[in-house]
Amino acid sequence: MSDFKKSETTIQSGQHVLIRLPSEGLKIVHLQDTGIIGLGKFGSFEVSNILGYPLGTSFEIIEDHKVKPIKSISTLDLTDSDETVQRQELTKMFSDSAENNQNIINIGSKIQKLSKDDIDELKKSGASSNVGQMIIEKMIAGHEGFDKKTIFSQQKYLKRKQQKFLRRFTVDYLGGSELLQYYIEKDLNRVLDLSVETLGLMLTYSNVRPGGKYLIIDETGGVLTYAMMERMNCEGTIVSIHENEHANLIALRYSDYGNELETKTVKSVNWLQFIDPQSERIDWTDLPDEEVKKIKNKSQYKKRRDRALQINEVIQLVEEGNFDAFISVSTLNMSEVLEYVLPKIGGSRPIVVYNQFKESLLEVQQALSGDKRVLAPSIYETRVRPYQTIPGRMHPVMTNRGGGGYILWGTRVIPHDAITAVGKGFAKRKRVETPSKTDTGTVEVQNDQENSA
């Protein structure tokens, strides 16, 4: 295993980080001791200038690929006195606002007095974000309809211009949530419309923790596996079922855990090995050292030996069963899959199935409702609604990405058919009246309850 240890607090060379741009774009980079990283229109910077700072620090690009730390991407880095002046200027700027946008007349670029040539000239005057801030201030001053906007519209306008002209970026830790955000922006279909909040809900419902043994189906390219490894601190076992020759876990290339630790934690098994492990087991016997020395291609022999041991190891895990949870992010028909999976899950352990379509989970829920092995299968969904805030006021953002998918959650139980539950809903057994004879020979009917009294 590599001696490199991934840091969760400090920017250091040798690890992958997530760079957030003013345009809300995301970029994953691998940091080296030296080198220049380009950020497109936002400029480029020398890697050595950001090493040693805490993760989450924002930087501003200045001349000669140099950077300086700032408070955040959207706020100016000012002294206390300058910050007070800037706050007063912004307050004055936003004080001339309307209650609504009905007085705005859309006449296109004619409403802006600052021409494109003027903006290009300002850009050439320097590479610092101070130039970008100056452009924004001149554009606001030259906007004839700025005072007719509501204060919320004014802030949105200011934010759009900051995203376009400020040369800034933030370096964040690349965790499971951050990696999912990156794939959502890059290729939403790859992660099956999974949202960050839904991923967190899945890990909570499945009780993922260090030292656990989990059975999963991951069709997100390894994003689910990445998030589980991070939450488990690489302590425990993850058995991933796949339907191809090799499991698609390409997202693990950003993990920085090393091949040895990944191999130790994550085991892959195909469906044939999972359903019929006995026929897929490899009978392997190590050759004596004398015969190994005679082999010309020793590397090929070692690869065959390692593969046989890995396959037999994961088959042994499948045969033992008693997994701590089953987690699925897949497009497979779960009604059929669960018939093979449920016997491998331990009692009182969670079953968590994700699908981007609710109708698919309704079919699974209907199938499990009559199955005594799964208790209370329920479907959940979660939504996070962002809000735009200004001092003293707030309102929800009017447009947001939909989707996020749905989760089916149930508890694996071990039914016992020989036990009959008695309790509420069962009527009491009626007492049987038996005849008894008196001393005179007459028959008298007595109640068993009265006799016992």
UniProtKB/Swiss-Prot annotation:
It comes from Candida albicans (strain SC5314 / ATCC MYA-2876). Keywords: Nucleus, RNA-binding, tRNA processing. The keyword Nucleus applies. One of its GO terms (cellular component) is nucleus. This is tRNA (adenine(58)-N(1))-methyltransferase non-catalytic subunit TRM6. InterPro entries: TRM6. It is found in: Nucleus. GO terms for molecular function: RNA binding; tRNA (adenine(58)-N1)-methyltransferase activity. Substrate-binding subunit of tRNA (adenine-N(1)-)-methyltransferase, which catalyzes the formation of N(1)-methyladenine at position 58 (m1A58) in initiator methionyl-tRNA. Belongs to the TRM6/GCD10 family. GO terms for biological process: tRNA methylation. Heterotetramer; composed of two copies of TRM6 and two copies of TRM61. Residues 430-453 are annotated as: Disordered. The keyword Cell inner membrane does not apply.
